[in-house]
């Protein structure tokens, strides 16, 4: 009796990575979301390995340099002055305090330091301190990122001249769902700021938040918008909604965690050379789901015990997970995608 052979079954033959010039229609992105889960993850991992070390993850630390009192009415945000969340508005931090936090982040293993301010846009009086923060953090050998709201051309250029590596300005969601979350800033406002950032020579960090009550098609609409930016973002943070008490999205039903993993995979396939970052809401994922996110192509995460005003898994727990998975922390230079 002959020994039975084991057949190896591969997913249907489809291109692993689309040409860089491809326009991602929403229907095309929906089709990715609707692939069988194993096929989607397999394809995303193939794309990931074409461009990155599959076992390297960049650690980023995010510091709120100006908390609360924001003029915008973003429905997910505890820092909006429109919502009663009990968060007290604070002034912009002193430069020395920011640099102390950056030193601590570096000592804890971070290679990227992000500074966030709860503003509609920075005022001119803030720019000297902001540029000093950028220069000081860069002198520590850390990659720098800021998120300060909308920018004017001159402000973007000032930050570029100071050496800012990345500017974060998220699209948040699809154009169709956007009006259900925010009314004080238009979608075009966000796109205009991204243009100013890119024109100033700063790398673009742009992603969104999922789990706000949007449909799968609307999630696909967000990914389509991001992937069709010219060029697509260098860094793509994917946030899982943290439904904060006192915000309009309080009580929103949690997103199926496998849908979050699917979103990571679709982002990797459609933006193959971008750094895909696990951001807010990571504490809602257990170790197994976080491992799936890395398998799906996430290669950066926010690291530390707090993200702006929401909690984040403890640093020691993160290090233990890395050890169990054989993942190593990567510096900024190593996160450049292969051609």
Curated annotation (Swiss-Prot):
It comes from the Bacteria. [2Fe-2S] cluster binds at residues 114, 145, 205, 277. SMART domains: BATS, Elp3. The keyword Lipid metabolism does not apply. Its EC number is 2.8.1.6. It catalyses: (4R,5S)-dethiobiotin + (sulfur carrier)-SH + 2 reduced [2Fe-2S]-[ferredoxin] + 2 S-adenosyl-L-methionine = (sulfur carrier)-H + biotin + 2 5'-deoxyadenosine + 2 L-methionine + 2 oxidized [2Fe-2S]-[ferredoxin]. Residues 55-282 form the Radical SAM core domain. It is an enzyme of class 2 (transferase). Pathway: Cofactor biosynthesis; biotin biosynthesis; biotin from 7,8-diaminononanoate: step 2/2. Keywords: 2Fe-2S, 4Fe-4S, Biotin biosynthesis, Iron, Iron-sulfur, Metal-binding, S-adenosyl-L-methionine, Transferase. InterPro entries: Aldolase_TIM, BATS_dom, Biotin_synth/BioAB, Biotin_synthase, Elp3/MiaA/NifB-like_rSAM, rSAM. GO terms for molecular function: 2 iron, 2 sulfur cluster binding; 4 iron, 4 sulfur cluster binding; biotin synthase activity; iron ion binding. One of its GO terms (biological process) is biotin biosynthetic process. Transmembrane segments: none annotated. [4Fe-4S] cluster binds at residues 70, 74, 77. Binds 1 [4Fe-4S] cluster. The cluster is coordinated with 3 cysteines and an exchangeable S-adenosyl-L-methionine. Its cofactor is [4Fe-4S] cluster; [2Fe-2S] cluster. PROSITE patterns: RADICAL_SAM. The keyword Nuclease does not apply. Homodimer. Belongs to the radical SAM superfamily. Biotin synthase family. Catalyzes the conversion of dethiobiotin (DTB) to biotin by the insertion of a sulfur atom into dethiobiotin via a radical-based mechanism. This is Biotin synthase. The lineage of its organism: Bacteria, Pseudomonadati, Pseudomonadota, Betaproteobacteria, Burkholderiales.
């Amino acid at each position: 009796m002959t020994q039975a052979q084991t057949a190896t079954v591969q997913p249907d033959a489809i291109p692993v990575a689309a040409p860089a010039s491809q326009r991602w229609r929403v229907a095309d992105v929906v089709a990715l979301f609707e692939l069988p889960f194993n096929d989607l993850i397999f394809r995303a991992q193939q794309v990931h390995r074409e461009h990155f070390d599959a076992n390297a993850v960049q650690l980023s630390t995010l510091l709120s340099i100006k908390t609360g009192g924001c003029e915008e009415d973003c429905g997910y945000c505890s820092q909006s002055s429109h919502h009663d969340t009990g968060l007290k508005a604070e002034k912009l931090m002193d430069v020395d305090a920011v640099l102390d936090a950056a030193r601590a982040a570096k000592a804890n293993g971070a290679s990227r330091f992000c500074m966030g301010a709860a503003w509609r846009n920075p005022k001119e009086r803030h720019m000297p301190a902001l540029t000093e923060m950028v220069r000081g953090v860069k002198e520590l050998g850390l990659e720098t990122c800021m998120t300060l709201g909308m920018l004017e051309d001159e402000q973007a250029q000032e930050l570029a001249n100071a050496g800012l590596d990345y500017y974060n300005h998220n699209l948040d969601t699809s154009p169709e769902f956007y009006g259900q979350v925010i009314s004080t800033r238009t979608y075009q406002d966000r796109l205009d700021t991204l243009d100013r950032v890119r024109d100033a020579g700063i790398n673009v960090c742009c992603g969104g938040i999922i789990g706000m009550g949007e449909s799968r098609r609307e999630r696909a609409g967000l990914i389509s918008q991001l992937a069709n930016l010219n060029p697509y973002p260098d860094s793509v943070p994917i946030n899982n909604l943290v439904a904060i008490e006192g915000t309009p999205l309080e009580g929103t039903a949690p997103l199926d965690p496998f849908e979050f993993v699917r979103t990571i995979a679709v982002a990797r396939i459609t933006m193959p050379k971008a750094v895909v970052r696990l951001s807010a809401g990571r504490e809602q994922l257990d170790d197994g789901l976080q491992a799936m996110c890395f398998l799906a192509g996430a290669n950066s995460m926010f690291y530390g015990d707090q993200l702006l005003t929401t909690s984040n898994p403890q640093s020691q727990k993160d290090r233990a997970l890395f050890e169990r998975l054989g993942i190593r922390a990567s510096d900024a230079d190593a996160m450049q995608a292969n051609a």
